[in-house]
């Protein structure tokens, strides 16, 4: 009887120690299984933090598998605090103010747009000066064409055309009031003809853009003198390319190969 009690007293502590060791082994075997599960549930538990700060440990899963839970959490917080400023959006972009709706462009883009507008403002006067120079060079070479701006396109210089161009003709006389008459001038580019043959029989004729249909108008002027002054003005209606004759009134302006006929005025 005493021997039996002695054996029971000895075996009871041994059984407790073995069960305690088995429990530790079970916990150690279950901890690797629970650890990845807790790590998988970590982003879902803190969903707002995952949206603002992306998980940097997705690209390096071996760091999470080998490190304990506490050490991995500290390392995670350290990495997020270091790189969080690159990923977190500023509050001004996440919550735009009302003033930003009224602004058409951000301040940064305005500084870039202003120099471009400045360049456009600088280029526009140059184009205007170029147009003025072109009109001065082509149509203001002689005193007869001074002050006349003609509606002629620049590409028509290279065409063989002859047409009427409307303009306002000013009739003046000394001691009289000036009168403005709406008239047409002939503008265009005509060709030349050369007939081959012997040296003494060869003939070359050049055609000019001249009036084909016109009328004359007697225009009386209001003068301070007692004698009245009447001007005869040729009003051009149609133009065509033809050879210039001596009896036709008016004068031809030569601008390179381009010819212009302005109707003359006789007293």
Swiss-Prot record:
Post-translational modification: N-glycosylated.
Region (Disordered): 19-52, 87-113
SMART domains in the cross-refs: CT
Keyword Transmembrane helix assigned: no
UniProt keyword annotation of Secreted present: yes
Subcellular localization(s) per the UniProt record: Secreted
Glycosylation-annotated residues: 26, 222
Pfam families referenced in this protein's UniProt entry, alphabetically: DAN
Domain CTCK per the UniProt entry, residue ranges: 162-246
GO biological process, one term: negative regulation of cell population proliferation
Signal sequence annotation: 1-17
Disulfide bonds: 162-209, 176-223, 186-239, 190-241
UniProt keyword annotations, A-Z: Cytokine, Disulfide bond, Glycoprotein, Secreted, Signal
Family the UniProt entry places it in: Belongs to the DAN family.
Protein name: Cerberus
Organism listed in the record: Homo sapiens (Human)
